[in-house]
Regions:
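Amphipathic repeat-derived elements
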Residues: 1-4, 113-119, 165
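Cysteine-cluster motifs in flexible loop/terminal segments that predominantly coordinate metals
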Residues: 1-62
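Detector for Asparagine
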Residues: 5, 42, 55-57, 67, ...
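Generic preference for well-ordered secondary structure
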Residues: 13, 54-57, 69, 102, ...
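Long, contiguous hydrophobic alpha-helical segments, chiefly transmembrane helices and signal peptides
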Residues: 16-18, 98-101, 114-116, 157-158, ...
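Ferredoxin-reductase
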Residues: 56-152
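FNR/FR-type flavoprotein reductase catalytic core
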Residues: 137-242
Length: 242
C-alpha cells in the first residue's frame, strides 16, 4: 500500500489545529478528515485530534497582527526597498528559519497585505530585515513607510522555500546556492542554516533585473564572497550556469 507524501508546516506548532480541522479537512489527522480510526501521516510528536478536543473542538488562534517601529528604510535605485523594524523577541526567533515570510501593510491600509520573505531576523537585536521589489500597486504603497513610523505585519509563516527539509538535513558537506534578482533576499536564511550545519557554501548571484547586488553587507557578515553570473538566458538556464 502506497501513501501520498503529505506534510503540513504548521503541524505540531502553536497554530495547530487550524480551520481545516474544524471543516474536517486536516491534511495529516485521519480522524479530522472523516475517518473513524487513527492513521496519521507524518507524525510530528503531537496528537492533532487530542489538541483539537482539548481546545473545545475548535481551531487554535491564528497568526497575530503586530504594529512595529521602522528602525531603518533604504530605497535602492527606485527599485528595491529595504526595511528594518523592531519586533517581539519570540516572533524574531520564529522568523529566523529558512523559508519564513510575513504579510505586511502600511498602518492606514487594511486592504493591501503583501507577502514578503524574511531577509534577516537578528535574535540579538530583535531587528527583522525585509527587501521588497517595487513593481505593482501593492508594493508601491509600501513606499509610504517612513523611518520612525509604524509597519503592520502578520505572521509568522513558514516554508516559503521549497525543499526546506533538505536544507536542514545538509550537514558537513558542500552546497551551491544560486539566486537571481529579489531571490537574493530569501537566500540569506538558507545560507545561514547551511553554514550553521558546517557546510562549505558557494554562492552564485545574478543581479538581473537590478542594477546592483543589494545584499552585499549581509553576505560579508557571513564571510561569503559571491560569484556573479548570468543565470537565465531567454527563460532557460544559461550555458554559463550549466
Amino acid at each position: 500500500m502506497f501513501k501520498e507524501n503529505i506534510d503540513c508546516i504548521d503541524a505540531g506548532t502553536e497554530y495547530c489545529p487550524c480551520k481545516l480541522a474544524e471543516s474536517g479537512e486536516c491534511l495529516l489527522c485521519s480522524q479530522l478528515h472523516g475517518s473513524t480510526f487513527c492513521d496519521c501521516l507524518n507524525w510530528k510528536g503531537i496528537c492533532i485530534y487530542q489538541e483539537f478536543y482539548y481546545n473545545g473542538n475548535k481551531a487554535k488562534e491564528g497568526r497575530k497582527t503586530y504594529n512595529c517601529i521602522v528602525e531603518d528604510r533604504t530605497l535602492y535605485d527606485n527599485e528595491v526597498l529595504l526595511i528594518k523594524f523592531k519586533a517581539p523577541h519570540k516572533l524574531v526567533i520564529d522568523l529566523s528559519k529558512p523559508g519564513s515570510f510575513i504579510f505586511i501593510r502600511t498602518e492606514e491600509n487594511i486592504y493591501f497585505d503583501v507577502p514578503i520573505s524574511i531577509l534577516d531576523a537578528n535574535i540579538d537585536t530583535n531587528i527583522i530585515s525585509i527587501m521588497i521589489e517595487i513593481r505593482g500597486v501593492k508594493t508601491k504603497k509600501l513606499l509610504e513607510i517612513k523611518e520612525g513610523g509604524n509597519i503592520t505585519i502578520r505572521g509568522p509563516y513558514w516554508n516559503g522555500v521549497f525543499g526546506v527539509k533538505n536544507i536542514k538535513k545538509q550537514k558537513d558537506s558542500n552546497a551551491i546556492v544560486l539566486a537571481r534578482g529579489i531571490g537574493m533576499a530569501p537566500m540569506l536564511p538558507v545560507i545561514k542554516k547551511l553554514k550553521e550545519n558546517n557546510n562549505q557554501v558557494t554562492v552564485i548571484l545574478d543581479k538581473a533585473p537590478f542594477k546592483d547586488i543589494y545584499v552585499t553587507d549581509y553576505l560579508e557578515a557571513l564571510e561569503i564572497v559571491p560569484q556573479e553570473m548570468n543565470l537565465i538566458d531567454k527563460g532557460e538556464l544559461s550555458a554559463e550556469a550549466k
